[in-house]
């Protein structure tokens, strides 16, 4: 038996490929007509020792079906279907400190991303940075906030606030951070 035949048998077992059950009746009729069934002199009856199992018979022969494996018929799977467990989120009560980053090169982007990944809001001050680095940092931060479901807001001219998912910065805090970033340039 070749590799192709083995792959076809495996595919047929799992329900892929051509459904041979459809053609089986025609083949059996041809075999009976030709008398090529070797059934020990009996006519009209196939040999009981060898027969092909259909899909439903195959699943019952092995004690399971694909519906049992992947469906919701099992008792464990249906346990929470009607009464899901009661879970409640506990808010994090720790005060979150906002960090200010004033990059001098694009290498500072990694430190910014590490802080952001730790769910820490970041102020990005690009007021003293050349336009090429500023553009690269804004593009990086836009991708970072998108990938981690965060938000990016303009706080002042060339000053941005990056807030992680599920973190809020109050309006007063934003205003204070913008003033702090503005006075840092003096």
From Swiss-Prot:
From which domain of life does this come?
Bacteria
Query: Is Aminoacyl-tRNA synthetase found in the keyword set?
Result: no
Quick one: where's region Disordered? Answer: 24-91
Any coiled-coil regions, as ranges: none
Cell cycle as UniProt keyword: yes
For this UniProt record, the keywords arranged alphabetically read as follows: Cell cycle, Cell division, Cytoplasm, Septation
GO cellular component entries: cytoplasm
Gene3D superfamilies per UniProt = SepF-like protein
* Xref: Pfam families: SepF
Q: Which GO terms describe its biological process?
A: division septum assembly; FtsZ-dependent cytokinesis
Localization recorded for this chain is: Cytoplasm
Disulfide-bonded cysteine pairs: these are: none
Matches recorded under HAMAP family: SepF
Q: How does it assemble?
A: Homodimer. Interacts with FtsZ.
Q: What is its biological role?
A: Cell division protein that is part of the divisome complex and is recruited early to the Z-ring. Probably stimulates Z-ring formation, perhaps through the cross-linking of FtsZ protofilaments. Its function overlaps with FtsA.
| PANTHER family from the UniProt entry | CELL DIVISION PROTEIN SEPF (PTHR35798:SF1)
Q: Which family does the similarity line name?
A: Belongs to the SepF family.
Q: What is this protein called?
A: Cell division protein SepF
Q: Which organism is it from?
A: Rubrobacter xylanophilus (strain DSM 9941 / JCM 11954 / NBRC 16129 / PRD-1)
